[in-house]
Amino acid sequence: MNRIDRVTAILIQLQSKRVVKAQEIADRFGISLRTVYRDIKALEESGVPLAGEAGVGYSIMEG
């Protein structure tokens, strides 16, 4: 899976669940946590309003 497809799939996963942990994303796509953090940063830089909290996970901000 290329990066664009993976980042899109991560966005869909974030839209379908209230909170998603980085480890869940890493396990689902067979990638490292560092790659998850880079992909999340790419989503944020493209304008997706994300909230992340250590030990809790990532979610899309409402509003």
Predicted regions and their residues:
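Short, basic/aromatic recognition patches that contact phosphate-bearing ligands
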Residues: M1-G63
